[in-house]
Every structure is written in C-alpha cells, then in structure tokens.
UniProtKB/Swiss-Prot annotation:
Enzyme class: transferase
GO CC terms in record: acetate CoA-transferase complex
Keywords: ATP-binding, Cytoplasm, Fatty acid biosynthesis, Fatty acid metabolism, Lipid biosynthesis, Lipid metabolism, Metal-binding, Nucleotide-binding, Transferase, Zinc, Zinc-finger
Oligomer and partners: Acetyl-CoA carboxylase is a heterohexamer composed of biotin carboxyl carrier protein (AccB), biotin carboxylase (AccC) and two subunits each of ACCase subunit alpha (AccA) and ACCase subunit beta (AccD).
Main localization, broad class: cytoplasm
Name of protein: Acetyl-coenzyme A carboxylase carboxyl transferase subunit beta
Catalytic reaction equation(s): N(6)-carboxybiotinyl-L-lysyl-[protein] + acetyl-CoA = N(6)-biotinyl-L-lysyl-[protein] + malonyl-CoA
Pathway it works in: Lipid metabolism; malonyl-CoA biosynthesis; malonyl-CoA from acetyl-CoA: step 1/1
Family under the similarity heading: Belongs to the AccD/PCCB family.
Species whose genome carries this gene: Baumannia cicadellinicola subsp. Homalodisca coagulata
Gene: accD
PANTHER family: ACETYL-COENZYME A CARBOXYLASE CARBOXYL TRANSFERASE SUBUNIT BETA, CHLOROPLASTIC
Length: 295
C-alpha cells in the first residue's frame, strides 16, 4: 500500500479500469490522418468525412451500394482458379490463392452481377484489389466475358469498376491472353451499340489499364486514383528523370484528355444512371441525387 492510500480514506479511492474497446471500431485516414469511426466510414462508402480521400473498397460492397437492392444476381460465381502451371516464386501459387480466398471471402479478383440501376437493367463488374492485387487471371477474364455476354443477351449497358495491378504473373501467358479476350468481347458489345462505362479506381495499372479499363464509351475515374501501365517509380528509374507532381493521377489524366470525367464515389450511382439514361434514350431521371438503392 502506498503512503497516499494510508493517508486518504479508502472509501474515496476508486480503482481505475482499462477501457475495454473492441478492435476495429476506429480507423485512420491514410491521407489526412483523421481518426474515423469505422461504422460511419462504411456508411460513407470508405470516403473520408474530413478530406474526401477515397479509400479502397471491396468489390462486393461496391456492387451492393451501386445496384438496386432487390435485383442482384451474381454471374460466374462457380468459376475457380486452378494452378495449372504449378507456379512457384517465394510461395506456391496454390497457397497464394488459398490465402487470398480466406482474406477476401472471394474465389477470384472479379465479381460480376446482373441487376438494375434506378430501375434500368444493367450488368456490373468490380475488381477485388485485396485478391492478389486485383490481378487479371483466366477466371477474371472469363467472368468479364460472361458479363459482356449477359449484357448482349439482355441488350443492356455494362459498367466495370477497375482496381488492379495488371495481369497475374503466376498464370503467365494465360493471363496475358485475357487482355485480347476481354477486348474482343467489348468489340461485340460496341457492334451492338450497347453502352460500356469503365470506372477507373485506385489503382488501375498494367494489363488491365492497357485493355478493358480504357475501352469504355465513357472512361470515368475516382478522385486521385493512380492510373497507368508501369508504376511511377519504374518510369523514373527507366527515364532517370523526376516525374511531374500528380503524374498518373486521375486529375493529371483528365487535364490531358486521357479520361472523360472524375466523379466522387458518393455521386457515382446517380451520375452513371443519368449518363446511361441519355445513352439509351430513356426518360431523364428525376433531378434528385438520392443515394438510396431500394426498389
């Protein structure tokens, strides 16, 4: 017992308790450092409430927020990746797949859904960056083609949200073939005059940016998204020159005509719906930016 406890009446001494706060309640913004309430950040679609920084969001959460709630149906969910080449670098490809599937609860890096957007029939796809960097595998390419074929069958628009490091090196040439495969599928969509909107999110790089991500009738980007083929560090090392500030960011690309517009994630659902209404000669939507996706 300390000397202060001997002097002061024990009845007025209240032992302190450690606050029992569960993990994951709070998170910090990568851009401004603001401490954010996790549940509030999720309601705001992973956009910082202080600085508007767009954090990465899972493919499934993005699609559920984008499409009308009562109409979603997943396509290609039965497809799973195979380690045909028995590839191994610092780790077996098979083990990488198991770890990625466990971490993301997805079978591969692309989720495709058929549904409606403000009542308009639509097919939408979204990359899961948490699955081996959103890299494009044979399954990703096949699911993308499934999405295009469904859009052709339903004669409806197709929207794809890209977030990828490029082709999956563990599948070698089979992964590179998906660039041509997805591009050929999109050519069929264009031949039928069906709209394809590509939304480039952070990051969209490599073989994905060199194929399906830049082939949209409209190419939209989220704010400050990294978009390019090789990364800025690789370019600097190759050219031995310092790159301009903001190089390969969506604002830099918009100023030079490489993309069509930049749209905040919270406005994306409404803006795309309005664009598709015009592209498909539908009646204009009511002039309200409602983010509710109920039917």
């Amino acid at each position: 017992m300390s000397w202060i406890e001997r002097i002061i009446n024990k009845s007025i001494i209240t032992p302190t308790r450690k606050a029992n706060i569960p993990e994951g309640i709070w998170t910090k913004c990568d851009s401004c450092g603001q401490v954010l309430y996790r549940a509030e950040l999720e309601r705001n679609l992973e956009v910082c409430l202080k600085c508007n920084h767009h954090m990465r969001i899972s493919a499934r959460v993005r699609l559920h927020a984008f499409l009308d709630q009562c109409s979603k149906y997943e396509l290609g969910s039965e497809l799973e990746p195979k380690d045909i080449l028995k590839f191994r670098d610092s780790k077996k490809y098979k083990d990488r797949l198991i770890a990625a599937q466990k971490a993301t609860k997805e079978k591969d890096a692309l989720v495709v859904m058929k549904g409606t957007l403000y009542g308009m029939p639509i097919v939408a796809a979204s990359f899961e960056f948490g699955f081996i960097g959103g890299s494009m595998s044979s399954v990703v390419g096949t699911r993308f083609v499934y999405a295009v074929e469904q859009a052709l069958l339903d004669k409806c628009p197709f929207v794809c949200f890209s977030a990828s490091g490029g082709a999956r090196m563990q599948e070698a040439l089979m992964s590179l073939m998906q660039m041509a495969k997805t591009s050929a599928a999109l050519a069929k969509l264009r031949a039928q005059c069906l709209p394809y909107i590509s939304v480039l999110t952070d990051p969209t790089m490599g073989g994905v940016s060199a194929s399906l991500a830049m082939l949209g009738d409209l190419n939209i980007a989220e704010p400050k998204a990294l978009i390019g083929f090789a990364g800025p560090r690789v370019i600097e090392q190759t050219m031995r020159e310092k790159l301009p500030a903001g190089f390969q960011r969506s604002e830099f690309l918009l100023a030079r005509g490489a993309i069509d517009m930049i749209v905040n994630r919270l406005d994306m659902r409404w803006r795309i719906a309005r664009l598709l209404a015009k592209l498909t000669s539908r009646p204009p939507l009511k002039s309200t930016n409602s983010q509710e996706n109920t039917c």
